[in-house]
Each structure stands twice: as C-alpha cells, then as structure tokens.
C-alpha cells in the first residue's frame, strides 16, 4: 500500500449498481455462471450487500464469491452469507501484527481476525486465505501458515509475487512455487488433490493431519493463461480479458447512451474482448510491460 494511499475515482466515473446489474444479467444470459466481487476493498462501498442480493436473484448465476482484506468482515459476514455469497477469500500476507502494519500501513490485524472468526462462525466454507510470498519479507512465515492450516479448516493459498502495476517490479522478492513447496514439505506432508470446480488457478494439496488444505498459485513460473476463462469489469466500467494487459473496452458509454439496443452493443463488446484475449501474459519476460492500473483498480 502506498504511504499516501490510493487515488479515488470521482463518483460519476464509477458504475452504478443498476449498470453493474445490467452487465451481469447480460453475461449470465450468455454463459457466465460465476461472479467474484473484488477490489480494492468491496466492503467499503455503500449498499454492497444489496448489490449481492440482486446478483443472487439473476437466473442462471450459480456462484457468488468475494475477496476482501477482512477489516470489515466481522460487520458484514452474516449479511453477506444471507445475501448469497458462497465463498470468501481473505488477503492475509502475514501472521505478525507489526509486519502486517508495515505491509498495509494500518494497525487493524485484530479486525481481520475478528472477521475471519465471524465468517467461520457464520458458516462460510471454505474460507480461503491468500498469501503472497515475498522473499525477505514474509517467506519465513510459511511454516506458520502451514501450522494454521493444520489447526483450522482454512485453505491457505500461497501466491507467487507478481507485478501489480504499483511501481517497479522488485524481482528480488520473487520466490517460485517450486521453492515454496520445498519449504512446506520440510514441515508437513502434502499430497496433490484432484482438481475442483472452485479451485480457480490454484493447485490444491491435502495436508496430512490437518483440518485445512494448502494451495499454490503460480502466475509467473507456471502461468495458467491457456485455461483462463475470466473477464473483469472494473469499477469505472472497463471490460478486461487479461489481468496483465492494459487492453480494455469501455462499457460505460454504452450503458449511459440511452440506446434501445444495449443488448446488441454489449454482445459486440463482449465478443471483441473474448476474441482479443491474449494467448499469454508477459510478466515473466526480462522486460515487463508496465500496467496502466494498479491491481486494486483492476480486481485481482
């Protein structure tokens, strides 16, 4: 997190909930079955629970999940569950309060843990904890996260450090998944699990003697571009077919045009996004192209 915080968008630049629902209804009618709500931090937007309730009522949508930093989860966990959220992902890169404060610039780790406990008590299952592993920053905590998965029914997902668009990519902090697995095997027995429909890009492993499981996401060392089936809609109405490409299509003019044939125009733009989806990203090349947006502005 930059010390000065993140630049916010003017209210009029952000899609209204009506506009989001319009896009979601079109997408679901044309084959999308899952929606993930991300950020930034989605729970800071007023009325988010109402949006989820409306999404949940769309015929054909079978799964709604949410990624959060957890700071407001204690307040919203029960409402989210009732609204139709099926699964929760919580970004948590450290178990150490001081390191948490250094990484996030906020002393709110107690709030995050209160949110995790509330989500568990509410009935969310699975609860996934996303851990970006950084050499020299938090990699020594790998055994601690493994121990947490032994004690709690959480899915710990170790994620390779990758470019986020927020300044230069500090490659010295990168650790490939193979090395992370080696570190895990030093403290626990793990065995690969068959793929599950809700795994996404993660490869899951059973943790011997554990209540939870371990997963690995390898966007740099073993990218999953050939199986990527995701589209992203940013808060300001841009449709993106790749997390690591600045190629995007602005849907906002269509949604605000007053046209009687918005459906046909959305179809054209969705088809364009899908037909121009890159075959693969370039983040593991020597010269990494800079991203025009931070990851928080895209929805990682």
At which residue positions do the language-model features occur?
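Short, flexible helix/strand-to-coil boundary loops that buttress conserved ligand/catalytic motifs
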Residues: 1, 77, 104, 243, ...
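Generic structural signal for secondary-structure transition and capping sites
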Residues: 60, 154-155, 189, 275-282
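Generic alpha-helical structural context detector
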Residues: 25, 53, 147, 163, ...
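Radical SAM enzyme [4Fe-4S]-AdoMet core and its adjacent flexible, acidic
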Residues: 98-101, 106-113, 117, 121-215, ...
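Canonical Radical SAM [4Fe-4S] cluster-binding loop centered on the CxxxCxxC motif
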Residues: 1-15, 243
